[in-house]
């Protein structure tokens, strides 16, 4: 039997087979209202039974950036070439794992996922080998939500995580743009 992150994370989190698939994305209306109506309507295509995406990305100009909303994450860069100094890189720690937990994307397996995340936080600076292994498991779960061969397959949960992450990062950028220049956006 071959083992990879798909089988390891799936087997670790589930004991009773596949998780339940969602029939629609699970994002509160109030969160969807934080983006432009055109972006919101693009994302709501995910609730159509045929699940055929007519629009794949929408680009908006805001705070000096071309910001691309889509189904693979939020991406943004300055609209024109710029020269900058004193650059700071900010990273949202365990963003997708925390969204997976918040949305309960794994159903009953979410509690095991929480245990893995808590264990990783506990040993992050004490045991690099175990910490990196747990990080690999945590991060592979998001991809497995959209992997048809995984017991974790739940495409609308994957898209819910992705959309939620885009809204959260977009909101963070809007708030930061009052006090700094945004030069790169990437979920």
Give each language-model segment a name.
Residues 1-87, 92-98, 175-187:
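Conserved "right-hand" nucleotidyltransferase catalytic core of DNA-directed polymerases
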Residues 82-187:
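Conserved catalytic core of nucleic-acid polymerases
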């Amino acid at each position: 039997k071959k083992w990879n992150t798909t089988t390891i994370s799936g087997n670790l989190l589930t004991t009773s087979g596949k998780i339940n698939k969602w029939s629609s994305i699970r994002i509160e209306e109030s969160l969807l209202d934080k983006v432009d109506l055109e972006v919101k309507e693009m994302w709501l295509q995910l609730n159509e039974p045929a699940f055929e995406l007519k629009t794949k990305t929408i680009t908006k100009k805001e705070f000096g950036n071309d910001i691309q909303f889509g189904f693979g994450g939020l991406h943004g860069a300055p609209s024109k070439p710029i020269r900058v100094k004193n650059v700071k890189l900010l990273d949202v720690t365990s963003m997708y794992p925390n969204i997976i937990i918040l949305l309960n994307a794994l159903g009953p397996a979410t509690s095991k996922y929480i245990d893995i995340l808590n264990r990783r936080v506990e040993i992050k600076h004490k045991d690099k080998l175990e910490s990196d292994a747990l990080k690999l498991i945590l991060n592979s779960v998001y991809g497995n939500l959209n992997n048809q061969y995984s017991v974790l397959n739940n495409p609308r949960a994957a898209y819910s995580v992705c959309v939620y992450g885009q809204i959260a990062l977009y909101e963070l950028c809007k708030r930061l743009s009052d006090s700094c220049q945004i030069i790169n956006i990437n979920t």
